[in-house]
Amino acid sequence: MKAEVAHFTTEQMVDMVGLLSPCMDDYLYVCDFKEDYYQISPNAVKRFCLPADHFHNVVEMHRQVVYPDDLDLLLVELELLSTGRKVFHNLHYRWLDKMGMPVWINCRGIVIDDSQGKPQYLVGCLNETGNQRRADNITGLLGGIEFNTYMRSHK
């Protein structure tokens, strides 16, 4: 798989995260390797040990949110992605919630190269893999919270 080529500025990509985030339960992110900058959906700050929805010093800031036993795994992955030795990110590991408890996530993304073919961005989506299902696909019944929401919306 070959990396895509950037046709957007960092600002445009960050704006896209802000635009699409309210439409999703998952968390979109943009990591700019050259600027050492990271932007994630604003609602991620409410859930995880993140100081803000955007920051510089990507590795140092991830030390605050990644479960310590999983940090080396992520650091190796980021090195491979930022040097072009890997172009697709798909990693299961743990982040810390606001209470400091580990939360299993799946983080996927794709590397986007600059015009010289060097990795510039990693863009993708982070989702919680431990979330309870909202509905049972066998019975078709909604789960508790979803059922209550559905009933309130149909009064």
Enumerate the language-model features and the residues they cover:
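PAS-family sensory domain signal
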Residues: K2, F8-R63
